[in-house]
Amino acid sequence: MKVLVLGASGHIGARLLEMLQATPWAAATGASRRMKNTASWLELDSRDPRQLAQALKGFDAVVNCVAGDAASIADGARALVQAALQVDCPRIVHLSTMSVYGPAEGNVREDAPLDPTLGWYGQAKCEAEAAMHDFVRHGGEALMLRPGCVYGPGSQLWVGRIGRWLQAGRLGDLGIAGDGWANLVHVDDVCQALLLALRLPAAQGKIPVFNLAAPDSPRWNDYFVDLALAIQATPVRRLGSRRLQLDAWLCGPPLKAAERALKLLGSAGIKLPDALPPGLLGLWSQHIHLDTQAASHRLGVQWTPYADGLRDSAAWFTAPAGAGQATLDKMICTP
């Protein structure tokens, strides 16, 4: 099977490409805006249907791991569908997110209604899913995965910046503000699910959808304390809601503005504190628990135990070239 991985320079895409290239059944090629010096790599703008159509010729499937801003996610998905239909690329495996469920709480299955009201990220992901439905209506095959918070080695979002906030005393035991379910899923488990989805039979006109989160994933407070102990960011502080609100709403916007300005200036090596996005305050207290029975039973995902994922994450964070120091090239402009 010839497989093209879009967004292959990102956290999940890069690991997926490694795992695909180790299989006996896949011939994998990576693609992103940043070219790598390898024969199995394409440089392209995933928002350009013409570039995508040229790149997709001859591929049996494409995995969409594109991240970034709203245009990259939503417009990129629409461009991908247009290109795949044009050149008869038969299958898209699309990486979505649990953010499409909005502020839902309780045990959430894949048939729960989508809600794009949490912000630009959830809105863009909902639009991308709509594009996949359009692809299927026109005769294509699509499968969608909705992971929770992807941690493990290489995760700047859910290990790197969390660890740095813990080291700085800006995060710890949040009390009721951190009592939501973390819905953590190891990056290798996401990639395992993508590999399985590439070969899963799909009924015509239907899109199989799978939530991804480890069944033993803890609540956010437990994860913060566990990670702090594992990286020796102790003592773990007990933080009140007022302190978090001030950090997110007063300090967050200017830090984010400075980060974006310095990136535009090409000053990627400058160290800045990580901005605390206000949206995370809602996530950490949201009692949403992804139901992953379909991924366990239909896909056959074998989940990484939380203790092993925590150990892997801490080892990566504390390694000499790990994530313990924040520089602009490590920062990711997503929620």
Regions found by a protein language model. Name each.
Residues 285, 290-297, 304-335:
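Amphipathic terminal alpha-helices
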Residues 200-275, 292, 333-334:
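Mid/C-terminal beta-alpha module of Rossmann-like enzyme folds, strongest
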Residues 105-151, 173-175:
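Catalytic helix-loop patch of NAD(P)-dependent Rossmann-fold dehydrogenases
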Residues 3-22:
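N-terminal Rossmann NAD(P)H-binding glycine-rich loop of SDR-like oxidoreductase domains
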Residues 127, 156-161, 177-199, 207-211:
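Substrate-positioning beta->alpha
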Residues 138-144, 148-182, 187, 227:
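NAD(P)-dependent short-chain dehydrogenase/reductase
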Residues 62-95:
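NAD(P)-cofactor binding segment of oxidoreductase domains
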